[in-house]
């Protein structure tokens, strides 16, 4: 079932905040009022996952400039996130919150739970300031994501929100032309 244009469901979870080196509670209410990226991944202390999370960290400054909060989520606990952060070269670089979802509530809410393994699939969601999902990407377990494309998707989502009636075509980049759907464009693209 698609979550696009749907408000995220309620949840309460514990997260590890590497910036403050502390645990904190996170709820769906924390997503209101700003743009958010939620990056689900299968497991801590694994293989593709640290490469993805490090890549996301490499884009973190750009995401912060766009006013985007970043959260990673797995079905591990927040304690395991802290241990991973303390022992992995890649994960020790992270500045964004790592949400633990051992109850699988959030993973189920976003429909990325692999029922056979009990782990999260590789899902990335862009959530607007109203708590509504604007973009989703889910990859098979062996396929890592590229965070640089995520930055451009967020820019497009923000542009469309700020410019009602306009849409961003394929390969749209900030500063390039958008489209205004209407009868005058039918069959001309």
Curated annotation (Swiss-Prot):
Known partners and oligomeric status: Homodimer; disulfide-linked, upon oxidation. 5 homodimers assemble to form a ring-like decamer.
What is the active site of this protein? 49 (cysteine sulfenic acid (-soh) intermediate)
Sorted keywords for this record are: Antioxidant, Cytoplasm, Disulfide bond, Oxidoreductase, Peroxidase, Redox-active center
A Pfam family name for this chain?
1-cysPrx_C
Per its record, the protein catalyses:
a hydroperoxide + NADH + H(+) = an alcohol + NAD(+) + H2O
- State the GO CC annotations: cytosol
Occurrences of domain Thioredoxin (ranges): 2-159
Q: What is the name of the protein in this document? A: Alkyl hydroperoxide reductase C
Matching entries from PROSITE patterns are given as: THIOREDOXIN_2
Further notes on this entry? The active site is a conserved redox-active cysteine residue, the peroxidatic cysteine (C(P)), which makes the nucleophilic attack on the peroxide substrate. The peroxide oxidizes the C(P)-SH to cysteine sulfenic acid (C(P)-SOH), which then reacts with another cysteine residue, the resolving cysteine (C(R)), to form a disulfide bridge. The disulfide is subsequently reduced by an appropriate electron donor to complete the catalytic cycle. In this typical 2-Cys peroxiredoxin, C(R) is provided by the other dimeric subunit to form an intersubunit disulfide.
Signal sequence extent: none
One of the GO biological process terms: hydrogen peroxide catabolic process
EC number(s) given by UniProt = 1.11.1.26
Q: Which InterPro entries match?
A: AhpC, AhpC/TSA, Peroxiredoxin, Peroxiredoxin_AhpC-typ, Peroxiredoxin_C, Thioredoxin-like_sf, Thioredoxin_domain
Function, as annotated: Thiol-specific peroxidase that catalyzes the reduction of hydrogen peroxide and organic hydroperoxides to water and alcohols, respectively. Plays a role in cell protection against oxidative stress by detoxifying peroxides.
Q: Does the keyword Disulfide bond apply?
A: yes
Localization per Swiss-Prot or TrEMBL: Cytoplasm
């Amino acid at each position: 079932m698609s979550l696009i244009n749907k408000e995220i469901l309620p949840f309460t979870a514990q997260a590890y905040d590497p910036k403050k080196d502390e645990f904190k509670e996170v709820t769906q209410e924390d997503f209101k009022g700003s743009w958010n990226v939620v990056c689900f991944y299968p497991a801590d202390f694994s293989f593709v996952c640290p490469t993805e999370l490090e890549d996301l960290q490499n884009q973190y400054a750009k995401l912060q400039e766009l006013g985007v909060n970043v959260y990673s989520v797995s079905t591990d606990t927040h304690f395991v996130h802290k241990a991973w952060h303390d022992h992995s070269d890649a994960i020790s670089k992270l500045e964004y919150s790592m949400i633990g979802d051992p109850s699988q509530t959030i993973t189920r809410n976003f429909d990325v739970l692999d029922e056979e393994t009990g782990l999260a699939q590789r899902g990335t969601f862009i959530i607007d300031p109203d708590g509504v999902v604007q973009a989703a990407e889910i990859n098979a377990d062996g396929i890592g994501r590229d965070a640089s494309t995520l930055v451009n998707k967020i820019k497009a989502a923000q542009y469309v929100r700020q410019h009602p009636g306009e849409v961003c075509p394929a390969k749209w980049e900030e500063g390039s032309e958008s489209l205004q759907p209407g009868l005058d464009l039918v069959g001309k693209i």
